[in-house]
């Protein structure tokens, strides 16, 4: 699976960013999504946004999964983790 960074669009006013970040992995599982998973979550309450580190076979697969649980997406970027040399 490929790794992605997902930046949400501004969440609706009634959605708490921290709750969204915490619940999104479970929401994907409960929605029966098996081809995408969220591995890390971050929230920015003042901006009303969340950021996810996710894995999926393709960008479109991940976008479809997030749309299924009503997470508004601003961008999805395929990434490769690079560890700095110490």
Where are these regions (language model features)?
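An amphipathic, aromatic/His-enriched active-site/gating alpha helix that lines ligand/cofactor pockets
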Residues: 31-34, 55-86
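Short hydrophobic/aromatic beta-strand micro-patches
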Residues: 9, 53-55
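Short S/T/G/P-rich N-terminal loop/turn motif that feeds into the first structured element of a domain
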Residues: 1-32, 39, 44-48, 81-86
């Amino acid at each position: 699976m490929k790794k992605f960074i997902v930046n949400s669009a501004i969440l609706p006013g009634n959605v708490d960013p921290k709750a969204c970040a915490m619940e999104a992995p479970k929401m994907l599982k409960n929605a029966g999504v098996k081809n995408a998973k969220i591995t890390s979550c971050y929230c920015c309450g003042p901006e009303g946004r969340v950021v996810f580190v996710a894995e999926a076979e393709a960008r479109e697969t991940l976008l479809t999964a997030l749309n299924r649980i009503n997470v508004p997406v601003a961008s999805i970027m395929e990434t490769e983790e690079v560890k700095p040399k110490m």
